Amino acid sequence: MANIKQQKKRVLTNEIARKRNQAIRSRLRTETRKFNAAVEAGDKEAAEAQLRVASRFYDKAVTKGTIHRNNAANKKSGMAARFNKMA
């Protein structure tokens, strides 16, 4: 455990950030899984709706600093490519 006052504060701040990032990453994986399930099922409408939702969550994760913007762009373009292959 830290002895310096500021480091004690940082430990608390880092724990809060860790939990927030964990929740955001978990939600990203969930939404991506839902999109993949819709694509596998061949349900174009559900896949399109889920693509929109997942893209929004990736953008939010970038805004919060949880993932890098290039990582989000890569994931989103991959999902878009899978969606476009459905047609």
From Swiss-Prot:
Provide the Gene Ontology terms for cellular component: cytosol; small ribosomal subunit
* Keywords annotated in UniProt: Ribonucleoprotein, Ribosomal protein, RNA-binding, rRNA-binding
Which GO molecular-function terms appear in the entry?
Answer: small ribosomal subunit rRNA binding; structural constituent of ribosome
Give the signal peptide, or none. Answer: none
- One BP term from GO: translation
- List the Pfam families hit by this protein, alphabetically: Ribosomal_S20p
InterPro entries per UniProt: Ribosomal_bS20, Ribosomal_bS20_sf
Answer whether the UniProt record assigns the keyword Ribosomal protein to this protein.
yes
**Is-annotated flag, keyword Magnesium?**
no
- What is stated as this protein's family in its record? Belongs to the bacterial ribosomal protein bS20 family.
| Protein function | Binds directly to 16S ribosomal RNA.
Q: What is this protein called?
A: Small ribosomal subunit protein bS20
- Which organism is this entry from? Corynebacterium jeikeium (strain K411)
Q: Which gene encodes it?
A: rpsT
